[in-house]
């Protein structure tokens, strides 16, 4: 199985990339110029943005089967998995953005009762950032390209999209549908290619935001290059996401828990940034969990061969890395009992789902993110010591999963272990929540997106304050000449008083309720006296 993108894709000439970026920037400024001459720019902009999102929706809808077929060609992903995790999720996201966009684009009123601002009007509006770069990964080549693209469109930006060259069939279909969807020329530009093309995009320094999804290693390169031009970036990375089955988990629910864990660990052949990377099981329930693993695995995969609907590793290097990791472990292994692979598995890039147990923290599988269909299981005794080990070895995972019937245990884990997200009682499924933020913390990335949060990510919040001219009687003390009397007035009118003492205890008094009104009266009196 070979995914050499250069044999299928027409890579964008590096010499043309600067021109493409300039087209994107120019279209944004021309669009804003036209809007500025409208009687109601915000209303016109809303109509434009919603129209583009509607075009994107039908482009995906009309090409859904073609996209699913392309993903199958790229890495043998079965149709149900692509429908569940890519096309349906994406179309729902687009429809949700269209629906909530009128509310999102509406400015927010802010109030401040202190004298300089009490008669003015303060609003916070969300404006487009400008031209943005989206660099998409291979593991969900459609969703992780078009979901941020939809958010960027909703926020009124122009976009340069760099699909993954490792899923070339999907990249071709995505470019074709974007080209034929009826978008204005310059609104969405596609750059096809690999390292050279991506490097040129990052080096141009002309973007207003860079949105990257991928590995922490490349993410650090993206951040470093973005910093040179002070370009903000969002990094959606990964890491070793732990899963807990705690002491106080009902044994009767072990099978359900394992089904949900295996769904996340082996779906997409483990090539998911939020896959359960390893499983931590309390010693009291460990034997029952291990015993049930084989049963659930065989229920999922009653037979396993080259015809099985199981996603392949993306290319031979990923396959070889996964096999080497599995071969290097010192643990015991559980695989589907009826494996029959007659073809060359290296050519197929097919790695069977593998559970590894009887291992410790020093096992090779515990050194870095596996990103393969392998699930190491570690037995633990003390929860606090286990959390200490996670913090020491693999702090700030993208997500943590907890299977426990004790809120005390859940609180202990949540309070101590930082993570981008957390799911209690399931795995992976949280990424499908339409209007919840998805993103990492620390080494698993920064920034987030998803519905409202995606719109915010691709927008800039701008404060607009409008001051009337008739209220100068509340502002005169800021003008020269200065005096001790004005200083006292400023302090009395502007300086808030604490409602707590030096020990942090709250104190009660009427002053905080009446000081503002008294200040306004005093200012008016002094102003009248000074003017006479």
UniProtKB/Swiss-Prot annotation:
PROSITE patterns: ALDEHYDE_DEHYDR_GLU
Disruption phenotype: Results in coenzyme Q deficiency.
Cellular localisation: Lipid droplet; Mitochondrion outer membrane; Endosome membrane; Cytoplasmic granule membrane
Membrane topology: Single-pass membrane protein
TM spans (from-to): 134-152
Keyword flag Transmembrane: yes
Any one GO molecular function term: carboxylate reductase activity
Residues modified as Phosphoserine: 111
Gene Ontology terms: cellular component: cytoplasm; endoplasmic reticulum; endosome; endosome membrane; lipid droplet; mitochondrial outer membrane; mitochondrion
Main location per the UniProt record: other
Reactions that this protein is recorded to catalyse: an aldehyde + NAD(+) + H2O = a carboxylate + NADH + 2 H(+); hexadecanoate + NADH + 2 H(+) = hexadecanal + NAD(+) + H2O; 4-hydroxybenzaldehyde + NAD(+) + H2O = 4-hydroxybenzoate + NADH + 2 H(+)
Keywords noted in UniProt: Endosome, Lipid droplet, Membrane, Mitochondrion, Mitochondrion outer membrane, NAD, Oxidoreductase, Phosphoprotein, Transmembrane, Transmembrane helix
Short name of one Pfam family: Aldedh
Domain of life: Eukaryota
Keyword Oxidoreductase in record: yes
Family per record: Belongs to the aldehyde dehydrogenase family.
Protein name, entry field: Fatty aldehyde dehydrogenase HFD1
Species whose genome carries this gene: Saccharomyces cerevisiae (strain ATCC 204508 / S288c) (Baker's yeast)
Gene that encodes the chain: HFD1
